[in-house]
Amino acid sequence: MKIGIDSFGCDHARSGLGTYLLSFISNYQKEDGVTLELFGSPLDKFTYTSGKDIKFIPVNVSDSLNAERRWHYFSAHAFVKKHGYDAVIYPAPERVLPVSFKTRSVVVVNSVIDTKLEDNFAYFTRKKIRKSFDAVDRIIAASQFIADDLISHGIDKNKITVIYNGIDHKLFYPPIDTSDDFADIKPFAIRKPYFTYGSKLSGPEKKHIELIKAFSLFKEKTKLPHRLVISGSDGEYSDEVHKAAFESPYASEIFLTGFFPHESFAKLYSDSDGCIFPSTVEGVGLPILEAMATGVPVACSSSCALPEIAGDSAIFFDSDNIEEIANCMERIVVDEGLKNTLIANGLERAKSFNWENTVRQTIDIVKKLVNG
């Protein structure tokens, strides 16, 4: 059985979609009778398959979303047929996907549909996604929240299976010693204590500005020495976020790192006093699990998939309520009993999310689809 995996739309492993694909490939265990093969941008020749016995087929397409969409619309069928795939997995269907399929197809959905449709072609893209999802054979939703969102858009619920993403427990685990005064994460030396939030500055729904305001309120109320570290690439909303940080009375205590390598988040989390995650558009919420796995308390939004993912291992707030966010920041620092409970529950919660299970369950779905 030959399974193709489409790496287009995964941002060269510099976003959540790219992290998904990189983690999937890294944790794939070769099995008899199954061959995986990736295809995508020539820029990704070594991005996902380095060190793995998995072939990568470069496709000569310009490195732009519109060019990749055109290729999927006009050329994907011929490519899939030429390479003899029995099935194809599409990890970024919200961004690039054929509108019809002549080979068995599985899409993996890691976000609610509407959050990816804020460009000039939103209406066309929404119709195209619906048409493609109607034609696809199987849909894997990374949370029940995503599954419910798909069903609300009229997608056949019988096509949908929920398979949770994993976290890399070889990377995210409690450190032995966090007693240093600084988190030494090259090229940064971040003074402790601090709160952290890892998210691209991509839009108002990520609630960076609300967090900055809440942090300012926390500082004013408690006079504690904490800093706020926001780690994520600049995006469409970066000017507004930088302006809010600059105008805060505690601007000198707010640090925006820009792009932050995924592997560096483990130390960023473990050396922090807590992960504060106010985003209201998370379909998966892996960052809160990664933070839990490093042994730090988590406070997050009470919306989207975060309550489903966190369970009883976090405290929740309304992301539009600045005082609630600030109060949660204070509680996980001042209330030792709460802090210790969140850490213990979080460590246990994180154990139930692993990539080995994600990969095995996904491949099983493809095998059943191909074999009938």
Task: Name what the model sees in each region.
Residues 1-372:
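Carbohydrate transferase catalytic cores enriched for Leloir-type hexosyltransferases
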